[in-house]
């Protein structure tokens, strides 16, 4: 043992930083924190570590485990009158699918009062209009309240945000009631989301549900001064909500106490991976002390499942319906229109009282295209339209959203910045002007036309430029009983025939 409290496997020179350590060779011990070569053994825990930095991180985890309830210490109390058979029947009726941990997964609840939530939180839910939980909330909330890690999937607009905010607020409230002398007010939970708009929305909902409780939030996104965000955290908050890039930037420049984080949430995790945030997410996670992990997404891919497995050893999978198929509440109308005719077709729709159902969102593929099309709509049709995309300043984006959601502007032209997560409560029509690059993104985009199962319409422009999506698009249209343009059928059949010839059928 040396003076730093580490027993070296080989050398007596103790490395200070994890980055200074090499990767392990076959058969060599691995650091329990970062998986680099576990050159040393921590005296206090007898675990392999690679450096003093990782030893300190390990000891913080141990201290955190002494302070906080174990994951088996439930905030949710199972109804003694319910049986596993009753739970199976209810799940079958509501199309709820659960995998992992078997009987450890609590049954779905039919009311929020069944979850053992603080009375003030129940009142806030009622005031906010949450009369009864949605299917994803019925299963995800009690599962999350047990402290187990969770990967949950449901249609866009199905209430996923409350599915993680309710457990977070409940756990934070319980923690403060059990530790009244703790005046530090260090963060107890963190939510990461892929866009600034979604982060703003999550914080708004968190403030509404946490009103009157010992629950404060900090919004950490680009476009706002970092100094104000840092000051807010230093004043004491329970929940940090931010985009991965901004949170990494904040942590790299300032010391933020994250050892008390009990719950770590990734919202719209598939979108986060698509945007290349995986490394930043992992960097943030490694700064935490083994929190409960909650992942939410409208679609589930192998990559999403892989990320879930890397963040939590054991994870419960909860899905409502088929997470990779279009929302059945959205009526899809596919229109074959050549690229040069798309603008005129859009103008015709917006002029038609039969086809235009404002307020509507028009999705395009480029930021410049969004600005130009919004201006053209206003000039040509007389229908006021605004655009929104990632290049606009945060204040302007907030003003645009306020005008649209407030009913001042009937048409919003958007890039994929609004394709994920953001609640567009007033929208019942989506026009897909430019097809997304993947069918999963298409499913997200048209899902904006429905909220909480209410009927909506998605008008989709299709032409030969979208050839790579034809088979998946036909399947998506068929799954909801939508009519398929004959041009799309003919070209899809021809593509399949040529493919068979190429592979030797």
Swiss-Prot record:
Entry EC no(s): 3.6.4.13
Residue window of motif Q motif: 110-138
Gene3D superfamilies tied to this protein: 3.30.60.220, P-loop containing nucleotide triphosphate hydrolases
Name of the top EC class for this enzyme: hydrolase
Listed Pfam families: DEAD, Helicase_C, zf-HIT
Residue ranges annotated as motif DEAD box: 267-270
Domain of life: Eukaryota
Alphabetical list of InterPro entries matching this protein: DEAD/DEAH_box_helicase_dom, Helicase_ATP-bd, Helicase_C-like, P-loop_NTPase, RNA_helicase_DEAD_Q_motif, Znf_HIT
GO MF: ATP binding; ATP hydrolysis activity; RNA binding; RNA helicase activity; zinc ion binding
Domain Helicase C-terminal stretches: 342-492
Reaction catalysed by this enzyme: ATP + H2O = ADP + phosphate + H(+)
Binding, ATP: 154-161
Domain Helicase ATP-binding: from-to ranges: 141-318
Protein family according to the UniProt entry: Belongs to the DEAD box helicase family. DDX59 subfamily.
Record protein name field: DEAD-box ATP-dependent RNA helicase 41
Organism name: Arabidopsis thaliana (Mouse-ear cress)
């Amino acid at each position: 043992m040396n003076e730093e409290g580490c027993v070296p496997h080989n050398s007596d020179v103790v490395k200070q930083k994890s980055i200074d350590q090499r990767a392990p060779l076959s058969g060599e011990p691995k650091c329990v924190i970062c998986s680099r070569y576990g050159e040393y053994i921590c005296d206090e825990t007898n675990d392999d570590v690679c450096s003093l930095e990782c030893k300190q991180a390990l000891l913080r985890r141990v201290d955190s485990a002494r302070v906080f309830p174990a994951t088996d210490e439930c905030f949710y109390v199972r109804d003694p009158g319910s049986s596993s058979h009753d739970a199976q029947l209810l799940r079958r009726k509501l199309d709820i699918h659960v995998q992992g941990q078997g009987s450890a997964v609590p049954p779905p609840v039919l009311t929020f009062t069944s979850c053992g939530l603080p009375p003030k939180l129940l009142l806030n839910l009622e005031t906010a209009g949450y009369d009864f939980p949605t299917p994803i909330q019925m299963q995800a909330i009690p599962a999350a309240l047990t402290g187990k890690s969770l990967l949950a999937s449901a249609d866009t607009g199905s209430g996923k945000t409350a599915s993680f905010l309710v457990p977070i607020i409940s756990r934070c409230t319980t923690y403060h009631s059990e530790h009244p002398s703790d005046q530090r007010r260090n963060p107890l939970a963190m939510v990461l989301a892929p866009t600034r708009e979604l982060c703003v929305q999550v914080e708004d909902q968190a403030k509404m549900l946490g009103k009157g409780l010992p629950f404060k939030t900090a919004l950490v996104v680009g476009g706002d001064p970092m100094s104000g965000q840092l000051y807010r955290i230093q004043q004491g908050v329970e929940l940090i909500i931010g985009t991965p890039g901004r949170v990494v930037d904040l942590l790299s420049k300032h010391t933020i106490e994250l050892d008390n984080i009990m719950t770590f949430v990734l919202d719209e995790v598939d979108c986060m991976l698509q945007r290349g945030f995986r490394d930043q997410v992992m960097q943030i996670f490694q700064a935490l002390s083994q929190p409960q992990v909650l992942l939410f997404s409208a679609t589930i891919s192998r990559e999403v499942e892989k990320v879930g497995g890397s963040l939590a050893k054991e994870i419960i999978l909860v899905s409502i319906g088929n997470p990779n198929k279009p929302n059945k509440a959205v009526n899809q109308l596919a229109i074959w229109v050549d690229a040069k005719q798309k603008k005129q077709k859009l103008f015709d729709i917006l002029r038609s009282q039969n086809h235009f159902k404002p307020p509507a969102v028009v999705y395009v593929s480029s930021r410049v295209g969004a600005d130009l099309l919004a201006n053209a709509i206003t000039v040509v049709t007389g229908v006021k339209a605004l655009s929104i995309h990632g290049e606009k300043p945060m204040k302007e984006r907030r003003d645009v959203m306020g005008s649209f959601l407030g009913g001042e502007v009937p048409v919003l032209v958007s890039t994929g910045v609004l394709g994920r997560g953001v609640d567009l409560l007033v929208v019942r029509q989506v026009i897909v002007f430019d097809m997304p690059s993947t069918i999963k993104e298409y499913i997200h985009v048209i899902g904006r036309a429905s909220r909480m199962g209410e009927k909506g319409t998605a008008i989709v422009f299709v032409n030969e430029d979208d050839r790579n999506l034809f088979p998946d698009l036909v399947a998506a249209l068929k799954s909801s009983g939508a009519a398929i343009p004959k041009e799309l059928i003919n070209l899809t059949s021809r593509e399949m025939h040529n493919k068979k010839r190429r592979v030797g059928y």
